[in-house]
Amino acid sequence: MFTSTGSSGLYKAPLSKSLLLVPSALSLLLTLLLPHCQKFFVYDLHAVKHDLQIWRLICGRIICLDLKDAFCSGLLIYNFRIFERRYGSRKFASFLLGSWVLSALFDFILVEAVQYSLGVTVASNLPSGFLAPVFALFVPFHCSIPRVQVAQILGPLSITNKTLIYILGLQLFTSGSYIWIVAMSGLISGMCYDRKVLQVHQVLRIPGRMAEFFSWALEPIFSSSEPTSEARVGMGATVDIQRQQRMEQLDRQLMLSQFAQVRRQRQQQGGMINWNRLFPPLRQRRNINYQDGPRSEQRASPPLEVSEEQVARLMEMGFSRGDALEALRASNNDLNVATNFLLQH
């Protein structure tokens, strides 16, 4: 029930692999061999605020001191590797950096808000680790990954391809007393970065030169070999073609399931898809044919503006730009109708 998009393993996801291996190894090292050094990685807001120990904002927010949190966050990072493959390592790293920086600010705001509004004194030590960016990744996961029903239980309740990911997130959310503050700050920072609030995505991003340096220095260390199991899929003539076709097939299945769900919701509401937008009525077409040719050309309305974001989403599913533009114009910028139109033609 894990999200399955593209190749299995960590192929073409070096940043996800580094975030999965390095913090987990350091957490084990601090827990088993160096417990006396854990004090340097405690996320102490009181020490940051009153003693100006700014370094704790870095050390206290990288390594998990609780192995249970390290395990759950590692599983979530492994499943969220699909965003590194979709966006690229630089954009994925920029999202993590932006949400990591913003969440530090929201931690202080939430602690002060709880203290002054509810009169509840929050403990100075918040859960340590790279947790806020992990919760921030739930924002694009919820918005951009369609639901595919796997099984149905208890009538309206159903198990989807995203159920286990949400269960892992809930397990991490309930693992400590004050981890909900870190989770809320991560979700808020993820929404701010994903929605481009105050253009934070332009300010908090990885510079090109730095991305090139890390790509040259660290990518060979954390890069994974090409999976050989996919070569058995008899689709294309090469492994790259097979992988691309498999990714396109999975993405199309996801979007087709999403379209079926939207169609069922519209049928339950008593409404059907307005196919008149795709095929005009016969009377209207006759009136158009009776009009004068040059005059109708002068009165022709300009082409419909198409959202570039929706074009990009259709191109990510494997459709060409021309087909995506034509389908979106025919469906009046309805992404679900355009997707169904492209899947059936």
Swiss-Prot record:
Tell me where on the tree of life, at the top rank, the source sits.
Eukaryota
The yes or no answer to whether the keyword Endoplasmic reticulum is present is yes
Q: Membrane-crossing residues? A: 92-112, 126-146, 164-184
Q: Which residues form the UBA domain?
A: 305-345
Q: What does the record give as the function of this protein?
A: Restricts trafficking of FAF2 from the endoplasmic reticulum to lipid droplets. In association with LMBR1L and E3 ubiquitin-protein ligase AMFR, negatively regulates the canonical Wnt signaling pathway in the lymphocytes by promoting the ubiquitin-mediated degradation of CTNNB1 and Wnt receptors FZD6 and LRP6.
The record's Gene Ontology biological-process terms are:
negative regulation of canonical Wnt signaling pathway; negative regulation of retrograde protein transport, ER to cytosol; protein localization to endoplasmic reticulum; Wnt signaling pathway
Q: Which organism is it from?
A: Mus musculus
Q: What residue stretch is flagged as signal peptide?
A: 1-39
Give residue spans on the Extracellular membrane side.
40-91, 147-163
Any keyword Glycoprotein? yes
Record topology, Cytoplasmic segments: 113-125, 185-345
Give me the glycosylation sites of this protein.
Answer: 161
Its quaternary structure?
A: Interacts with LMBR1L, FAF2, AMFR and VCP.
Where it sits in the cell: the answer is: Endoplasmic reticulum membrane
From the UniProt record, report the name of the gene that encodes this protein: Ubac2
Q: Which lineage do the record's taxonomy fields give for this organism?
A: Eukaryota, Metazoa, Chordata, Craniata, Vertebrata
Positions of the region Disordered?
287-306
- What's this protein's name? Ubiquitin-associated domain-containing protein 2
